[in-house]
Amino acid sequence: LVPKNLFGNTVYLDPIKKANHYASLLRNEEKCDLVICLSHLGFKYKNDKVSDMVLATQSRDIDLIIGGHTHTFLKNPVRMQNLDKEEVLVNQVGWAGINLGKVDFHFSQNRGSKKVFGRSIFVQNSSKEA
């Protein structure tokens, strides 16, 4: 992704393998009901480059991916299926605070039962210009 002279001894690790490792740890060992991945992979590319959409389909135990890098404006989160055919939400809301994202997860008393609602909120300039 970046020429070697610009990253020195930095090691690039496979984001899908790392995401799956830590999502499993959070879900199974720490018993988290909700696992959120903050990503800067980019929403989607024309080729098979790793992106938020690829991560969603190649992952397990992640409920929500909040992404960046490509500055994609989504009106609502995209619903994808992971390797276990479970729903993963992918969301980006652009850049520069133009939009805010809101995703609500409602959990029932029965572990594993949840409802999800998400949307983007357009931020308007509320100050008056002279």
Please describe what each predicted stretch is.
Residues 1-128:
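Acidic, metal/ion-coordinating pockets
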